[in-house]
């Protein structure tokens, strides 16, 4: 990207910058490494102890009555560093540069162009890893459209009229006024992405979950992912929900349990995604507070959970990192994140290819089914299952934003 710019290897980052003499201080160089953020508003155990003991302090969790521990922690007062295997150096934005360092979160491996300052590196530009281009999908006639549906947060331990309407629409048990673009016969798979068993407290509740999944899986293949409120291991990657939870559903061959994060393929279309924690943590620790912005940031940086293991527990793999997106696995056409407040989607241009991003809503709060065409992933439909006698079918002209940005 930066022609005629001296590159300093990350394993000699501070050594290389330290060897720049005062005469060479204004020379532009490129460095790369791992981004580390010193977040001033980050929750602190000591701050909680001080608050409980009534000791005065400066942390907003103690001094601001309106402060919520779910509010974003990122602020303009955060300090951002670039780290190698020996030490770190602070990054500051060079005067006149439009680079926004605050939208970054810790854990991203990026390159920066700039000059050496006094005790810092003055950034003029930054670059993400080169994007991976997914395999081209042969375009077919629009009449051959086949869709994969996405829902999350069904919370089958709670009553929900919208969920019953969803099951009726999938199975064809009831006739409703739907748009032809939302024909249930065009859906070839349903992805239930996390928090399916939220609110389940009794055996009767579990039996209802099993019955619901079996009913749906007899009409369309179902892929189910574990979430933070499901009975699965705490650290990423979460293992598939155990088949013993679903004695009736497991008899249906078309019910598949996946890990979280999950990568799977339907037709020629590859899907990669996780339940909400990965994207939510990015929104907490950067100024990218929109879920789709956070998801795009992780896609461009080629890492699913950049804040792990700092803010998200993850299993320490010694030889490889399953949370890093590499060319060793099929490259995704669609990336999704689930259990969010609202459903949204976006198509981003990565140069040689386009990537579809999905924010899947928690169904009990925002009862929306997102449909992605496996023959054209930029073709996204949504159906809003509100508690009424009709379903609202919305296509690309619906109220969900779809940006085509780079």
Predicted regions and their residues:
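Extended recognition/assembly regions associated with phosphoester-bond processing machinery
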Residues: 1-406
